[in-house]
């Protein structure tokens, strides 16, 4: 599965369209950036409610496939700009992180 596949299933692209072909092998859900850096794995879709520019730096450091900002949280302009520069996809999801995780589980289990 690739980031692009999520766009047809309730997720909306906010930034980083240069990374839409990134492969996704798993999902990680966390809002504490230091915890994500320590525990997440490369090629994960990272679900968070954080929306500031530092999420892009963390996602790049851990080699995430994309960032999914749940709860309909608006992503800050600086984060959008940085994600576009780095080709790190940021997707939005209107539901809870739990609902996003269920949706991703269903998609990745196909």
Enumerate the predicted regions with their spans.
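Feature captures the catalytic cores and cofactor-binding loops of soluble hydro-lyases/lyases
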Residues: 21-24, 33-45, 49-110
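An N-cap/entry alpha-helix motif that binds or orients negatively charged groups
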Residues: 5-27
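Active-site rim beta-loop-alpha module in soluble metabolic enzymes
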Residues: 30
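Short, structural beta-strand-to-alpha-helix junction motif
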Residues: 1-4, 96
